[in-house]
């Protein structure tokens, strides 16, 4: 075959290159059992990530996940273009109407059980407990465990954010300065495309976001609070020297590349003394939560900023990150934004009036609900770290 001129096959208007395949023939067909039996010799390899217990009946592995995730997955029996289509069926974000973890009529669970030669036991809907995987062969149990973990992780990533970690930047003086900024922008630039009062942040909600979380159970919320306390004890106090960190918001910048089509305008946040302590602190908190799996790793460093204008606020004043990308039925929403022309704002307000914030943010890393405006003064103390415990029940599966 000529490598530079391969045979082309046209399918549905697309050209595909047909590459040669060197087929090998064997005297004897391999028995599927041979693969499982051979893998048992590697039972003690250190690369195994899962704990598998050997029992008189074979092998056993367990995993625990929020009961909400047990009820997510439905396998649509249609098969379009050779790809299985996964759909969600739910009543609302936190109360899902479905059968078991792996599919309508148990199709997905049966498929995993058949292909891995295992048996999978799952708690009934609404009940907490462990998923138990048993099988005659260790390799099969590990394979089933891996596939279930992938399914759970995939659907967790698709859930709307329930909480976020942030430092509040809503001191009275800062709110007043922000309102003056808003008034001046509307007075000078309200005729510019897309600029109106609806896209400004609520001054009570000014904050510096560290990361977004999906917490689906009381246990995960408690784990988050405990991890915040560990961060405080292990490095936050050392970085801050046990004293409040004095920061300021000065200057504005936009997220995208075209100042004429802006979706997010933010105020830059930095230490008043010019040090890097705030950046170090938030990066280490982010790193700790990413390592635990509570925050999906998308960035290696936190961008220190406080959003002051966001076009998502036009339709939802409580918009925060990915929070609004899914409906209550779990369907993805394409949110079409109406960008605004930020050129005059950037030119007229290149130096946002310096807004000093002198609160003890080193001791008040907050676990918040999207849309909440609780301040450190009104939020309750959770293990020495400010949290929003009274609102927790509103964010849990099955709670109304």
Swiss-Prot record:
Annotated spans, Required for interaction with ASCC3: 1-53
InterPro entries in the cross-refs: AKAP7-like_phosphoesterase, ASCC1, Cyclic_Pdiesterase, KH-I_ASCC1, KH_dom_type_1, KH_dom_type_1_sf
Subunit structure: Identified in the ASCC complex that contains ASCC1, ASCC2 and ASCC3. Interacts directly with ASCC3. The ASCC complex interacts with ALKBH3. Part of the ASC-1 complex, that contains TRIP4, ASCC1, ASCC2 and ASCC3. Interacts with CSRP1. Interacts with ZCCHC4.
Name the UniProt record assigns to this protein: Activating signal cointegrator 1 complex subunit 1
Lineage: superkingdom: Eukaryota
MF (Gene Ontology): RNA binding
Domain (KH) ranges: 86-148
Function: Plays a role in DNA damage repair as component of the ASCC complex. Part of the ASC-1 complex that enhances NF-kappa-B, SRF and AP1 transactivation. In cells responding to gastrin-activated paracrine signals, it is involved in the induction of SERPINB2 expression by gastrin. May also play a role in the development of neuromuscular junction.
Gene Ontology biological-process annotations: DNA alkylation repair; regulation of DNA-templated transcription
Keywords on record: DNA damage, DNA repair, Neurodegeneration, Nucleus, Transcription, Transcription regulation
Mutagenesis or variant effect for residue 318 to S: Found in patients with Barrett esophagus
Tissue-specific expression: Ubiquitous.
Keyword Transcription belongs to the record: yes
SUPFAM superfamilies on file: Eukaryotic type KH-domain (KH-domain type I), LigT-like
Keyword Nucleus: yes
Cellular component annotations (GO), alphabetically ordered: DNA repair complex; nuclear speck; nucleoplasm; nucleus; transcription regulator complex
Disease: Barrett esophagus: A condition characterized by a metaplastic change in which normal esophageal squamous epithelium is replaced by a columnar and intestinal-type epithelium. Patients with Barrett esophagus have an increased risk of esophageal adenocarcinoma. The main cause of Barrett esophagus is gastroesophageal reflux. The retrograde movement of acid and bile salts from the stomach into the esophagus causes prolonged injury to the esophageal epithelium and induces chronic esophagitis, which in turn is believed to trigger the pathologic changes.
Location within or outside the cell: Nucleus; Nucleus speckle
Main location: nucleus
């Amino acid at each position: 075959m000529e490598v530079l001129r391969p045979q082309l096959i046209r399918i549905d208007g697309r050209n595909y290159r047909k590459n040669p395949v060197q087929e090998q023939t064997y005297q004897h067909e391999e028995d599927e059992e041979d693969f499982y039996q051979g893998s048992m010799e590697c039972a003690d390899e250190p690369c195994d990530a899962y704990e598998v217990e050997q029992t008189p009946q074979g092998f056993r592995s367990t995993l625990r996940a929020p009961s909400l995730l047990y009820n997510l997955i439905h396998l649509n029996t249609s098969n379009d273009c050779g790809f299985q289509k996964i759909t969600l069926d739910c009543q609302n974000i936190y109360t899902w109407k479905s059968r078991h973890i792996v599919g309508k009529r148990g199709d997905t669970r049966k498929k995993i059980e058949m292909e891995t030669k295992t048996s999978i036991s799952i708690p009934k809907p609404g009940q907490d407990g462990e998923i138990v995987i048993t099988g005659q062969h260790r390799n099969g149990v590990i394979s089933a465990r891996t596939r279930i973990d992938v399914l759970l992780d995939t659907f967790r990533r698709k859930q709307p954010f329930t909480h976020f970690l942030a430092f509040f930047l809503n001191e009275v003086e800062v709110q007043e300065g922000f309102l003056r900024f808003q008034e001046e922008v509307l007075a000078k630039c309200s005729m510019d495309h897309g600029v109106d009062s609806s896209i400004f942040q609520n001054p009570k909600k000014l904050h510096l976001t560290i990361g977004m979380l999906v917490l689906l159970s009381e246990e995960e919320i408690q784990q988050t609070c405990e991890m915040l306390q560990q961060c405080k004890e292990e490095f936050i106090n050392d970085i801050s020297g046990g004293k409040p960190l004095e920061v300021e918001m000065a200057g504005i910048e936009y997220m995208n590349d075209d100042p004429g089509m802006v979706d997010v305008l933010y105020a830059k946040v930095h230490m008043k003394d010019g040090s890097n302590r705030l950046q170090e602190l938030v990066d280490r908190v982010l790193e700790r939560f990413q390592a635990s799996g509570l925050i999906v790793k998308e960035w290696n460093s936190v961008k220190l900023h406080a959003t002051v204008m966001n076009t998502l606020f036009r339709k939802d004043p409580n918009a925060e990150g990915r929070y609004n990308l899914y409906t209550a039925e779990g369907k993805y929403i394409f949110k079409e934004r109406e960008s605004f022309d930020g050129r005059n704002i950037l030119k007229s307000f290149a130096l946002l009036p310096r807004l000093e914030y002198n609160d003890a943010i080193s001791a008040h890393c907050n676990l918040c609900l999207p849309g909440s405006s609780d301040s450190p003064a009104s939020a309750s103390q959770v293990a020495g770290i400010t949290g929003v415990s009274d609102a927790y029940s509103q964010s849990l599966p099955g709670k109304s």
